[in-house]
Amino acid sequence: MTGAVGAVAAPRHTNTTAGAHRIADAFARARAGGRAALIPYVVAGYPDAEGSFAAACAAIDAGADLLEVGLPYSDPLADGATLQRASQGALAAGATFESSLALVGGIARARPRVPVVAMGYANQLIGGGDGRDRARALAAAGVAGVIVADLTPDEGGPFEAVAAEAEIAVVYLVAPTTAPDRRAMVAARSGGFLYCVSLVGVTGARTSLPPTVAKLVREVTAVSPVPVAVGFGVSRPAHVRAIARAGAAGIITASALVDALGPDGRDVGSLSALVAKLRAATAR
């Protein structure tokens, strides 16, 4: 007697998770308002736990639709000088992975309507295993999604699986140098949204963005089943306006906000004012 061999179920996509649905709802609210979603970035633990909590809440209150929280790391390869300085400052002030998640949990409880997306690196979030414990810890803290800056879909399958178990989305990145066919593949694997890097290089506020950014946004959006959010170099209302009008679903701003906090990292009023100006420029 022979028995039928059942088909092996395909791994669950992280875009079907509860976290991805929360992210989708945030993008949908912005779209219903005729604008792109604004996604400010803060570094967990910079200048210290209290200061970063204040900055996060101020960014949300000034108009954030989602919030990206960077987990401080000793070797942040994708970060420019501003974010490296903030990350080093957070570590010097005693920030750890655990304290960063405690901070995220506090933000999620204080401002529950705005999804939090954590950003880190593979050594932090996966290490030598599959990242299951870290994914569970992120979910327990209230994180909706996670960006692993140096993880590609080619190597990300095991982490996607444990993230799906934990109900959080795994957000991937594409760059101007990513080949068109690969952009489509990465977009198909990304959960929550797709992070479109606007320029070649590391993060950091720029006075201008590449003239090709609008074309890049249109091309990436055309092949992405999830919302496309554009980051790197976005620091001015004119940048936000141009990216929104090119059709991006979301706009990420990071270094400019850390700069706005001033030398001591505590000028929350200036950060709030900048977020409000950027939010006002998100209309399509």
List the predicted regions and their residue ranges.
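N-terminal amphipathic alpha-helix/helix-capping segment at the start of soluble metabolic enzymes
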Residues: 1-39, 104-109, 218, 283
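Active-site-adjacent beta->alpha loops and helix N-cap segments on the catalytic face
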Residues: 19-30, 49, 74-85, 92-105, ...
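Hydrophobic faces of well-ordered beta-strands that scaffold small-molecule active sites
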Residues: 38-42, 67-69, 116-120, 146-148, ...
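Conserved, mostly hydrophobic/aromatic
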Residues: 40, 59, 67-70, 138, ...
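Glycine-rich beta-to-alpha transition loops that act as phosphate-gripper elements at the mouths
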Residues: 43-48, 119-127, 152-153, 174-178, ...
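Catalytic cores of alpha/beta
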Residues: 49-58, 178-188, 224, 230, ...
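Glycine-enriched alpha-helix->loop->beta-strand junction motifs that scaffold or abut catalytic
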Residues: 63-65, 138-145, 164-171, 188-194, ...
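Glycine-rich phosphate-binding active-site loops on the catalytic face of alpha/beta enzymes
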Residues: 64-76, 143-155, 196-204, 233, ...
